């Protein structure tokens, strides 16, 4: 039982290493230009993408667009919430100022100064 478990983990570990080495090789080929390159058919005008790449590109563009819309929504929400709170605080301050009564001591000082 232990021998088969050990062999299974060694096998799985070897497969993981092979996949990571393949991934590393692909990344190195991509960065150095040794791998398969995307070429244009009409002299550099437009790139012809495979169907999977096209779907991935469209998915990424849609994700970016949705993220931009959500970011703008949050920014405008914070802005308008802040403006609304500022307006309410100004009206509350005006309400409190109108309800304030001056004390008799202040009136006496004002009469004494004039």
Curated annotation (Swiss-Prot):
Transmembrane segments annotated in the record for this chain: 61-81
UniProt record similarity statement: Belongs to the reprimo family.
UniProt topology in membrane: Single-pass membrane protein
Keyword hit for Electron transport: no
GO cellular component: membrane
Organism taxonomic ancestry: Eukaryota, Metazoa, Chordata, Craniata, Vertebrata
Protein name: Reprimo-like protein
Keywords associated with the record: Membrane, Transmembrane, Transmembrane helix
InterPro entries found in the cross-reference section: Reprimo_fam
Compartments where found: Membrane
